[in-house]
């Protein structure tokens, strides 16, 4: 379950996460750490497709998006048990299948910390091209009924007036959550069909603005 979540400014909780790992002597693993390996030295196990420069780290060379590439990690966990703690910071928004990644996190760890750009960040025109959010992000997230909800980045967010309504309630640019045992997650719509585009778009904004 999600034990705590909040909107924060980017990186606010990093020291708290490191302190939590150190004080509890948790075995820990950082998934997708290479771009910003802030969890070192408290966390010395890394999964990513590029190695970290630190030489005292257990590194698994894994394409995070390819489930078949995770074999070495799964074998390690089978032999040594689940990690006490996992970190997945600014990675879930980049992958094509965040539900699969969430399943993997639960398979390899007992609990964890996830940081992702907030919906406010993804609706903000961040760069000179005036597009909303980061172009390489494939989806964004919010917490709905204590569940991590995945919202596809549909093209209509660029022009629909309701996108600016979301920004009127701006809180912070990062969504952070702590989970334990299970990580509840689902995709907006939950596989149910919508009758026409208007139904889909209205439901999308109603959920985000509620």
Regions found by a protein language model. Give the residues of each.
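Conserved SAM-binding loop
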Residues: 24-124
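A short acidic, often aromatic-flanked loop/helix-cap motif at beta-alpha or helix-coil junctions
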Residues: 10-11, 52-54, 65-68, 146-150, ...
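S-adenosyl-L-methionine-dependent methyltransferase catalytic module, highlighting the catalytic core
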Residues: 99-210
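Class I SAM-dependent methyltransferase Rossmann-like catalytic core
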Residues: 1-22
């Amino acid at each position: 379950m999600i034990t705590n979540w909040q909107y924060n400014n980017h990186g606010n909780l990093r020291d708290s996460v490191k302190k939590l790992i150190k004080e509890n002597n948790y075995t820990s693993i950082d998934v997708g750490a290479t771009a910003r390996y802030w969890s070192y030295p408290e966390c010395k196990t890394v999964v990513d497709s590029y190695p970290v420069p630190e030489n005292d780290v257990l590194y698994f060379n894994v394409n995070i998006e390819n489930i078949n590439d995770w074999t070495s990690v799964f074998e390690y966990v089978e032999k040594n048990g689940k990690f006490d703690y996992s970190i997945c910071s600014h990675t879930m928004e980049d992958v094509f299948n965040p539900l699969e990644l969430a399943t993997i996190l639960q398979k390899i760890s007992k609990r964890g910390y996830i940081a992702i750009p907030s919906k406010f960040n993804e609706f903000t025109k961040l760069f000179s091209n005036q597009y909303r959010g980061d172009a390489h992000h494939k989806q964004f997230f919010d917490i709905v009924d204590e569940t991590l909800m995945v919202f596809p980045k549909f093209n209509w967010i660029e022009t629909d007036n309701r996108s600016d309504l979301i920004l009127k309630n701006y809180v912070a640019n990062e969504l952070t959550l702590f989970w334990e045992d299970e990580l509840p997650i689902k995709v907006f719509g939950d596989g149910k069909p919508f009758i026409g585009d208007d139904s889909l778009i209205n439901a999308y904004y109603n959920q985000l603005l509620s």
